[in-house]
Amino acid sequence: MILVLAEAALELVPESLWRHPAIVADARRRGKKPGEILLDRARHHVAMAKLDKAERRGRPDIVHQVLLAFQYSLLNRAGRGRAFVHTVGDYIISVKPETRVPKNYNNFVSLMEQLFKVGRVPPEGEALMEARRGSLAALLEELGGKWVALHEQGRAVSFAELGRAVADAVVVVGGFPHGDFENKWILEGAEAVYKIGNVSLDAAQAVCRAVAAAEAALGLI
């Protein structure tokens, strides 16, 4: 399975907020410049009040939860997984299978800030994660131009059928807290769209179940 977390709410604080008192105070506390810290709804709620599309931004915890679920899975450890993150600001983050994502959230935040600043982590030696400018469309084309999507409006299938469908596919999951894909072609151009259960699931919950289904289909569990 190649996981693509799309339109993820992961970005550095935009320049329009650099002078906001909440941003300045948080950056000073951490010994960084305002433009070097991640936008985080939990700490920057007041500053984000007038930010464009604020409801879809500032949730690095979603990316953290998804990568923890995926990178430490049996699927990934068996060499059958690869993860990519497409951010709201059109960055593409590639994550090597051997990458052990920090389990501590604060450490993860620091890692992402370094990644945006340097373009790779670690800064020297073999890169485990790399960030580059790029669109979601370009990434999916690089990955073969075919994908399936997980979405609450998709077709309900059995656990076994889901596993067979996603085990060797490019799987697109939304990485935002509210709303729907802004790129409507994600669902329109997908080979198939599946839903898991009868309620809307958080991204990490959807990924956990898709990964488990793939592991079962591949005989890993």
Curated annotation (Swiss-Prot):
SUPFAM superfamilies: alpha/beta knot. Keywords: Methyltransferase, Ribosome biogenesis, RNA-binding, rRNA processing, rRNA-binding, S-adenosyl-L-methionine, Transferase. S-adenosyl-L-methionine binds at residues 174, 179, 196-201. It catalyses: a pseudouridine in rRNA + S-adenosyl-L-methionine = an N(1)-methylpseudouridine in rRNA + S-adenosyl-L-homocysteine + H(+). It comes from the Archaea. The record marks 59, 100, 103, 107 as: Interaction with substrate rRNA. Its EC number is 2.1.1.-. It is an enzyme of class 2 (transferase). CDD domains: Nep1-like. GO terms for molecular function: rRNA (pseudouridine) methyltransferase activity; rRNA binding. The record marks 61 as: Stabilizes Arg-59. One of its GO terms (biological process) is rRNA base methylation. Homodimer. Methyltransferase involved in ribosomal biogenesis. Specifically catalyzes the N1-methylation of the pseudouridine corresponding to position 914 in M.jannaschii 16S rRNA. This is Ribosomal RNA small subunit methyltransferase Nep1. The gene is nep1.
